[in-house]
Amino acid sequence: WIMGHMVNAIYQIDEFVNLGANSIETDVSFDDSANPEYTYHGVPCDCRRWCKKWEYFNNFLKALRKATTPGDSKYHEKLVLVVFDLKTNSLYDHQAYDAGKKLAKNLLQHYWNNGNNGGRAYIVLSIPNLSHYKLITGFKETLKNEGHPELMEKVGFDFSGNDNIDQVAKAYKKAGVTGRVWQSDGITNCIASFIRGLDRAKEAVANRDSSNGFINKVYYWTVDKRATTREALDAEVDGIMTNDPDVIADVLNESAYKAKFRIATYDDNPWETFKK
């Protein structure tokens, strides 16, 4: 999965997919009452990026629905996965359940069209704080209460705080999550990737590939350089988040990687661990 980073303005959906992304990451900021409000990152953000592009969250969802609904004039067949980077650090821990509830209601109405031929992309809810695990509970229970528990099959999870993998496992246990787990690892592109290294990403890959692991997919962020792309592919990650999808696509075309990797399509289940 080539994951376009910080796609917060509607026009950027086309821009990133046209550069080669089959997945996008979108920031979601919340108001004081835990309502998802804007697709907005804010300052600071990655180097060489404008941090302040934004839309109202529901307007973005409607545009995203069009981009992922077959037959729509804005449809992109290859856009198959969306990561919502949920900026819940602005909330109190006790608001996490409400944030999940309100997020589910917004997605149900504006993205899934109340279950009536809505957008088809798989969705990853990426949460920065392990203590906000109740966001998952709130999301799940709301879809059930609204009569659409089946839509949870399109939803996976990520804790994005670079926490100890054992602690991440405990948070999922509390949330009752037993699958559909993506694990992120990484650092802003402003800091040279070798300073962080790929040790934790490799630890996540080892968990993914073990018989008793809880992780299904691993992605590494934010990668804009060819050398780092190669290192991430050599570590056998499933996804690379990038500001420059064309760079990742170029490296995937190199002879060393062409035979081993391909770009995921809608038929590739993002919740299944890939067996070599």
Curated annotation (Swiss-Prot):
Its main location: secreted. Keywords: Cytolysis, Dermonecrotic toxin, Disulfide bond, Glycoprotein, Hemolysis, Lipid degradation, Lipid metabolism, Lyase, Magnesium, Metal-binding, Secreted, Toxin. The active site is at residues 5, 41. Its EC number is 4.6.1.-. Mg(2+) binds at residues 25, 27, 85. Gene3D superfamilies: Phosphatidylinositol (PI) phosphodiesterase. CDD domains: GDPD_like_SMaseD_PLD. The keyword Disulfide bond applies. The keyword Glycoprotein applies. It catalyses: an N-(acyl)-sphingosylphosphocholine = an N-(acyl)-sphingosyl-1,3-cyclic phosphate + choline; an N-(acyl)-sphingosylphosphoethanolamine = an N-(acyl)-sphingosyl-1,3-cyclic phosphate + ethanolamine; a 1-acyl-sn-glycero-3-phosphocholine = a 1-acyl-sn-glycero-2,3-cyclic phosphate + choline; a 1-acyl-sn-glycero-3-phosphoethanolamine = a 1-acyl-sn-glycero-2,3-cyclic phosphate + ethanolamine. It is found in: Secreted. Its cofactor is Mg(2+). Disulfide bonds join 45-51, 47-190. Glycans are attached at residues 129, 253. Dermonecrotic toxins cleave the phosphodiester linkage between the phosphate and headgroup of certain phospholipids (sphingolipid and lysolipid substrates), forming an alcohol (often choline) and a cyclic phosphate. This toxin acts on sphingomyelin (SM). It may also act on ceramide phosphoethanolamine (CPE), lysophosphatidylcholine (LPC) and lysophosphatidylethanolamine (LPE), but not on lysophosphatidylserine (LPS), and lysophosphatidylglycerol (LPG). It acts by transphosphatidylation, releasing exclusively cyclic phosphate products as second products. Belongs to the arthropod phospholipase D family. Class II subfamily. This is Dermonecrotic toxin LsaSicTox-alphaIB2iii.
